[in-house]
Amino acid sequence: MAPAAAPSSLAVRASSPAATPTSYGVFCKGLSRTLLAFFELAWQLRMNFPYFYVAGSVILNIRLQVHI
């Protein structure tokens, strides 16, 4: 079985400028980089991610819904 690729590498391939032309400009690029950084961090810490999720939610006082 082939090893699973990191989600960020898949997202980078899927979000190349040639594949999806957008007019959001710099904001979209910055947001995409931020989201990719968080997805990469979540992938690397996938065993400990629930603990970081709870701690981050408590610290930032954010109530996020996760549908499984």
UniProtKB/Swiss-Prot annotation:
Residues 1-21 are annotated as: Disordered. The gene is SMIM10L1. This is Small integral membrane protein 10-like protein 1. It comes from Homo sapiens. GO terms for cellular component: mitochondrion. Coiled coil: none annotated.
